[in-house]
Amino acid sequence: MVAHSDYRPGIILGIARGGLLPAAAMAYALDVKNVFMMSVEFYTGVDERLDLPVMLPPLLDAVDIAGARVLVVDDVADTGGTLKLVKDFCAEHVANVRCAVLYEKPRSLVKCEYVWKRTAHWVNFPWSSQAPVVTHLPGRALSPTPISSDR
């Protein structure tokens, strides 16, 4: 879709974590070498989320994207809260910002310019459908979680 449009981004901005793999694929497909990421926490589980999305450090330095044509990439536009936060941040600094997602839900606040499919259902992606293989222990490094044979 993006490749067949007249939009030629100078920067691909992937939203971590769900948008990292689609952003990398998009960067290769469009031959864009400048790839950045922005970590945003919003979802804490299946259909569980914080009240508002929060940008996590390290924050993207606006000087790195100043004046650029940016394509923001994520896996899904569910409520659109994450994309709105990132798009609003970019809009203050860049020449143009557009969004690309694999899936867009009808309730999304942001209507993305590039959408592979639209759905009202929960989407499970291969990179996020399984539980983490490590657990966080307070004050310690990550500890491996035993993987059962039924995974």
Show the residue positions of the predicted features.
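PRPP-associated nucleotide enzymes
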Residues: 1-151
